[in-house]
Amino acid sequence: MPDAAKKVYLIHGWGANRHAFDDLMPRLPATWPVSAVDLPGHGDAPFAQPFDIEAAADGIAAQIDTSADILGWSLGGLVALYLAARHPDKVRSLCLTASFARLTAAEDYPEGLAAPALGKMVGAFRTDYAKHIKQFLQLQLLHTPDAAEIIGRILPDLARCGTPQALQEALDAAERADARHLLDKIDVPVLLVFGGKDAITPLRMGEYLHRHLKGSRLVVMEKAAHAPFLSHAEAFAALCRDFVEGGLT
């Protein structure tokens, strides 16, 4: 069990907010002090231009009194990598799900997404966010029996995504970011959880992280897509429990 002085912090992905974890949090041990945070310009968090990944990591570090277990989803996982590299005294472990060290492809990084594919993927969110975040959730939970109940519970709060400018700047920052040089500086236990059907952060991105984060463990949920903690909430929560309590070494 985590020491009472420690906390578990959950960091959401682009275009979401802390309410993305509303269905996961009740499944985690009641003894854990868990905090889900809003990234700058998302949810209720204020936005000071420009959106900066390092500043976002520093802002979360300022909230942490002692070493904490950090779970980051997608963009939140990228922020978590910067947090662990810049503030190693604040991070006890990392759980990264559907995340990346670099989002866009490069000559030396074929694991990334091609620019046209990335533009097509996010374009819909820019035009009608509320409509497409609901469709995104429906797709993620396609084979989940209580999908409608979950979506009905989290969608109203999740749809409070922040200003269009904040979302655009956060996306621009994610496209520019490259944390590959930080990976060998991270010396904490790392759990990587990826969906086998994820087209946004494909498994190859998780495999890259696994190769370059020493001692990491990669778990693939074959039928999950970009939000394993939603589509496979019980299994995901069990992985988190085992990992944080020392079951995965």
Swiss-Prot record:
User: Which pathway does the record list?
Assistant: Cofactor biosynthesis; biotin biosynthesis
Where, in this chain's numbering, is substrate bound?
14, 74-75, 136-140, 226
**Compartment(s) of residence:** Cytoplasm
Task: State where it is primarily located.
Answer: cytoplasm
| Entry annotation: catalytic residues | 74 (nucleophile), 198, 226
Q: Which reaction does it catalyse?
A: 6-carboxyhexanoyl-[ACP] methyl ester + H2O = 6-carboxyhexanoyl-[ACP] + methanol + H(+)
* Classification via InterPro entries: AB_hydrolase_1 (IPR000073), AB_hydrolase_fold (IPR029058), AB_hydrolase_sf (IPR050266), BioH (IPR010076)
Q: Which Pfam families match?
A: Abhydrolase_1
Top EC class of this enzyme:
hydrolase
User: Which GO MF term does the entry hold, naming one?
Assistant: pimelyl-[acyl-carrier protein] methyl ester esterase activity
Q: Does the keyword Cytoplasm apply?
A: yes
Q: What does the entry list under GO cellular component?
A: cytoplasm; membrane
* GO biological-process terms attached to the record: biotin biosynthetic process
Print the keywords alphabetically. Answer: Biotin biosynthesis, Cytoplasm, Hydrolase, Serine esterase
- Write the Enzyme Commission number(s) for this entry: 3.1.1.85
Functionally, this protein is described as follows:
The physiological role of BioH is to remove the methyl group introduced by BioC when the pimeloyl moiety is complete. It allows to synthesize pimeloyl-ACP via the fatty acid synthetic pathway through the hydrolysis of the ester bonds of pimeloyl-ACP esters.
Subunit details for this protein? Monomer.
Family of this protein? Belongs to the AB hydrolase superfamily. Carboxylesterase BioH family.
**Protein name in the entry:** Pimeloyl-[acyl-carrier protein] methyl ester esterase
